[in-house]
Amino acid sequence: MFTVKEKNRQELEEELNDLEFQIYRMQENMKDLSKDAKVLGIDQSKHDEWMIVSSIDDGQTCKIMLTDCKTAYRGKGCFSLVASYKDDAIHIGDIKGPPNHGFGSICMKYLKDIARDHNIPKVTGDIAKRDWNHVDRLIHFYEKHHFKVCIDHDTQSGSIKWVDL
């Protein structure tokens, strides 16, 4: 017995048109984006939106950016993760963008790949007082990505650490 609602012809045509538009926009955005950054790949958000993954890396700082394929690239992505190289670790400095779209998970996957490519065994970061209003969401996010999370509730701070095995 089928429990999935069957899509009608109009819904399928709308999905196809949306995908065709995203593919066209992806081509244009990749061409423009490649002038500013290194294109690492494409990925899908948890809402089935295609995203271009790119990075700018000067050897001291690495910025991983996501650019959607629904709007034109205008020099700025819709989500970013900024990290710096520290001895035997990459240290996450900031993650900017809307929550609960799967964008952070896409960036984290690519950050771990960069760490492995550079033979860097650890990714670290801090949880600051400014993050405290969404600390539970951060703990869930980092634990989902196999980070050890240490929280000090008294000082409203913490640290995260991932070690490649």
Curated annotation (Swiss-Prot):
Key words of the record: Coiled coil
InterPro entries linked: Acyl_CoA_acyltransferase
Coiled coil regions, renumbered to chain: 1-38
Gene3D superfamilies: 3.40.630.30
Domain of life: Bacteria
Listed name of the protein: Uncharacterized protein YocC
